[in-house]
Swiss-Prot record:
Residues 350-589 form the Histidine kinase domain. Belongs to the ethylene receptor family. The lineage of its organism: Eukaryota, Viridiplantae, Streptophyta, Embryophyta, Tracheophyta. GO terms for cellular component: endoplasmic reticulum membrane. Residues 158-307 form the GAF domain. Keywords: ATP-binding, Copper, Disulfide bond, Endoplasmic reticulum, Ethylene signaling pathway, Kinase, Membrane, Metal-binding, Nucleotide-binding, Phosphoprotein, Receptor, Transferase, Transmembrane, Transmembrane helix, Two-component regulatory system. The chain crosses the membrane at residues 23-43, 53-73, 92-112. This is Ethylene receptor. May act early in the ethylene signal transduction pathway, possibly as an ethylene receptor, or as a regulator of the pathway. It is a multi-pass membrane protein. The gene is ETR1. InterPro entries: CheY-like_superfamily, ETR, GAF, GAF-like_dom_sf, HATPase_C_sf, His_kinase_dom, HisK_dim/P_dom, HisK_dim/P_sf. It comes from Malus domestica (Apple).
Amino acid sequence: MLACNCIEPQWPADELLMKYQYISDFFIALAYFSIPLELIYFVKKSAVFPYRWVLVQFGAFIVLCGATHLINLWTFSIHSRTVAMVMTTAKVLTAVVSCATALMLVHIIPDLLSVKTRELFLKNKAAELDREMGLIRTQEETGRHVRMLTHEIRSTLDRHTILKTTLVELGRTLALEECALWMPTRTGLELQLSYTLRQQNPVGYTVPIHLPVINQVFSSNRAVKISANSPVAKLRQLAGRHIPGEVVAVRVPLLHLSNFQINDWPELSTKRYALMVLMLPSDSARQWHVHELELVEVVADQVAVALSHAAILEESMRARDLLMEQNIALDLARREAETAIRARNDFLAVMNHEMRTPMHAIIALSSLLQETELTAEQRLMVETILRSSNLLATLINDVLDLSRLEDGSLQLEIATFNLHSVFREVHNMIKPVASIKRLSVTLNIAADLPMYAIGDEKRLMQTILNVVGNAVKFSKEGSISITAFVAKSESLRDFRAPDFFPVQSDNHFYLRVQVKDSGSGINPQDIPKLFTKFAQTQALATRNSGGSGLGLAICKRFVNLMEGHIWIESEGLGKGCTATFIVKLGFPERSNESKLPFAPKLQANHVQTNFPGLKVLVMDDNGVSRSVTKGLLAHLGCDVTAVSLIDELLHVISQEHKVVFMDVSMPGIDGYELAVRIHEKFTKRHERPVLVALTGSIDKITKENCMRVGVDGVILKPVSVDKMRSVLSELLEHRVLFEAM
């Protein structure tokens, strides 16, 4: 037998077993070869795989294992030495790779186990995230319900609608069996069932506010679970049900107590609460969840805010209604006052005109009589009539001035005037009256008193005359001194005038006038009465000298208009008085002092006494007034033509007439239209006569209307001979004369 490299089997081969081994090795090899292919495929598909070199070793191990099984197919039969060598090599390589792979797995397995741990961690994290997402969804759902409820609650500002809407929306959102609101009573000692969801409860039922369960709820700002058997939770009859639903209660802060009529509480600053009770359905396993309790708490806060807003709105509406009622009442009172003022002013205007017309006749005729040959007794009688008439005319002026001062229609006429001349004129006017009573009157003008000032000359002179006139009136003998000087800053503030706040400036100064007399004096407690209308103190009344009339009351108002104040001082009866007032006057501009619009008044010895041949026209609808004015002018030598109608005047007027006196306040006759027609007739100014309004109306509108239509002067009735003489002199010299009103 020839030698060979074959390995002889030790036991006889069983063909069936050999066949099964052969088939098994084939499929094992096939599986071993397919596994690396699958690994390679899925590794390529995977973006991240950290153990590629381990995979190479593991793939080599599997391939070599498959190769050994594949080579083993040829070992079941007689095979050559080559096959045996290949088989041996494959097994050696397989052993090496297997050992290397086993050693490598020692390092890999912990990583794989950590991967598993991370997997479990991620699963737990995912579960936690799921729970958080569920919580977030629950919170979002709660927030949605809160927004919906808040919108419904705030859709109205009626508190009853707010509370009813709250119960309905909470009942619908939380599927409640019952929901109720307990409000505090007026005494604050009980809670009253005010609103319920199902309207099946005895609204008005009360429970004591100091119950432990109520104190428990009021002491917490959270929703509190309470027993279904507590008095505030017995809202529904169980009707055979044995398991009542869970009940929670929450406090509702009452941010505005007055809206709920609980003003009888001793401490309104203490916080007070209403109680909201919510009940889940009976015979139900449902329980309150945290997010539902949070929803209830938020809604309670929103209800508190909405109730506060509603209360504020209700109060503002009540205040608005009250204000509207007050405005209506004030408007009615204002209209009534305006009607009364208009009626008073109309009455005063009519009375002024009607009284000045006869007064004009009395004074004019008395002054005419005074210039005739009279006996001493007759002259005394005429002078008495004239003085009484002048006093009555002054009183009429005072009444009208006071009326205009009170209704605010009188305004100061600001102009530049000679301040020293005002005092000298007052002194000259008062001296003859004082000399009759053997009173000496002295005038002291400080050296630093400005010669010119800016202010209302007429009102200042009227104030000085009234104050000095009172001093003369209540002094039987002795002396009267008038002192005028610039008030220093330290002497301006006075405790008697707390509302007087003088302000120093380079543009104005404060004039201080002091009138001191040695007359009857006055009790200090009677001094405030002197500035009231027709004041008459006991001391004055006993001397038959009458009261202070309107003079001081008007002076006080004039002084206030001139931003000053006035006061009177006296040490008592028989010790004389000192009247002092301060007024604000302006400085004229230094550059214009040489051009001051001031014309000194004509002195008595410079006034023309007669006007022979001066042609004058007089128009007046009142026959007495027309005759008196004509008589005055005729006494002064004028050639007078008197008419009563406009057409008659327009017919007789000519260039020969130098002056036209006309009453512009005649009933049924428009004196202003007459002035316009005269201007149309005489287009050239030097051909037109001087137009003078002789009127009894002293209002400012009359003067403005006269100036508007081109009237050259306005003279107030009554007019005496001396006044008419000075008026004509002024008109002929300046062709303009507007008497101050």
